[in-house]
Amino acid sequence: MFGLYAGVRPVKAYPNITNRLSNKLASNIDLVILRESTEGLFYTAAVHNRCPVDNNEEVQDIMRITRKTTEKLHDFAFKLARQRKSKGKLGKVTCVDKANVFRSQALFRKIFDERKENFKDIESEHCYVDAMALNLIRNPWEYDVMVMENMFGDILSVSYTHLTLPTKA
């Protein structure tokens, strides 16, 4: 309806604030989780108004990925990485998906690979969402812009923003 397809979630460590990661490189965390905001697995909730469960035997949800929205999202990710690169950031886009399991995610990745050809000055890579959950604990400073489906972005952005918050005194 409003075309608000890109949810931009910055994750940044701030100087002189002790965060939850012990590695000294943690002070260099400055990344963006870019989540698609109108499709993905949350599409079912939007379409069906978060219906209560009325069938105790089986329920299905839809992970909707469209070419039109995904192309816009990936282009936005690469343009954001280019803008950040001009300000001294990494200038890298990571496509976070589960393409090895879901056909919808395989399409998401395929479109990413097509769109990256228009941004040859920007480094790009893939990472499965479960591996990314671990990588963001091990070495979050190695990422710049991460683009993903709505639910994955929701989970990772909430989880990893917490890592950069101050610890209790």
Ranges and model annotations:
Residues 2, 22-27, 86-88, 116-118, ...:
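Solvent-exposed alpha-helices and their adjacent loops that cap or buttress functional pockets
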Residues 1-63, 151:
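N-terminal glycine-rich phosphate/adenylate-binding segment common to multiple enzyme folds
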Residues 13, 98-99, 129, 151:
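Short, ordered loop/turn segments at secondary-structure junctions
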Residues 55-127:
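Glycine-rich phosphate/diphosphate-binding loop of Rossmann-like nucleotide-binding domains
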Residues 156-160:
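Glycine/threonine-rich flexible loop motifs
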Residues 105-146, 150, 154-155:
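Active-site rim loops that border cofactor/substrate pockets in soluble metabolic enzymes
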Residues 161-167:
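Conserved small/polar residues in nucleotide/adenosyl-binding loops
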